[in-house]
């Protein structure tokens, strides 16, 4: 297991109370040895005007996952902040849920890189994101 902080899914989800994460309906669903996953509904909260999943919602899911994964790689007195987010959208989603899967690409002392892949309910890749974070403290 790579994580330096050991949080349960319930503890992870509690961090979302009264935030944009909760407003978008993002829920952490799996914490593995080197992976963090979450689901987000595709509904009126996450649609763009044409009834499809908004690219910004996919980006919010990615940044949520990468930032929390980054935080779990810090020690007491440290935190992470996002420095760069890149998203490539592959296919539209109009309903249901999407699942984000976050894994590390680079874990340095001062910076981290995370890959977050967003899948639809059929397991098709909808969006590929890369998040860079800086470790502070």
Curated annotation (Swiss-Prot):
EC number, as in UniProt: 3.1.2.-
Pathway stated in the Swiss-Prot or TrEMBL entry: Siderophore biosynthesis; enterobactin biosynthesis
Annotated transmembrane regions: none
List of catalytic residues: 63
GO biological process, alphabetically ordered: enterobactin biosynthetic process
Keyword hit for Hydrolase: yes
Highest taxon, organism lineage: Bacteria
Record InterPro entries: HotDog_dom_sf, PAAI_dom, Thioesterase_EntH, Thioestr_dom
Alphabetized UniProt keyword annotations: Cytoplasm, Hydrolase
Gene Ontology terms for molecular function: 1,4-dihydroxy-2-naphthoyl-CoA thioesterase activity
GO cellular component term, pick one: cytosol
First-tier enzyme category under EC: hydrolase
Cellular compartment(s): Cytoplasm
The keyword rRNA processing is annotated on this UniProt entry: no
Free-text function comment from the UniProt entry: Required for optimal enterobactin synthesis. Acts as a proofreading enzyme that prevents EntB misacylation by hydrolyzing the thioester bound existing between EntB and wrongly charged molecules.
Complex formation: Homotetramer. Dimer of dimers. Interacts specifically with the aryl carrier protein (ArCP) domain of EntB.
Family: Belongs to the thioesterase PaaI family.
Full protein name: Proofreading thioesterase EntH
Organism: Escherichia coli O17:K52:H18 (strain UMN026 / ExPEC)
Lineage, opening ranks: Bacteria, Pseudomonadati, Pseudomonadota, Gammaproteobacteria, Enterobacterales
Gene (name only): entH
């Amino acid at each position: 297991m790579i994580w330096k902080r050991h949080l349960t899914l319930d503890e992870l989800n509690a961090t979302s109370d009264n935030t944009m994460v909760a407003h978008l309906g993002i829920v952490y669903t799996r914490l593995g040895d080197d992976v963090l996953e979450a689901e987000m509904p595709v509904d009126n909260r996450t649609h763009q005007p044409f009834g499809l999943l908004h690219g910004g919602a996919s980006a919010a899911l990615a940044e949520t996952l990468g930032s929390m994964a980054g935080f779990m790689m810090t020690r007491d007195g440290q935190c992470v902040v996002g420095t760069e987010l890149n998203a490539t959208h592959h296919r539209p989603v109009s309903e249901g849920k999407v699942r984000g899967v976050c894994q590390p690409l680079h874990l340095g002392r001062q910076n981290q890189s995370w890959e977050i892949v967003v899948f639809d309910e059929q397991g098709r890749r909808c969006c590929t994101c890369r998040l860079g974070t800086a470790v502070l403290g």
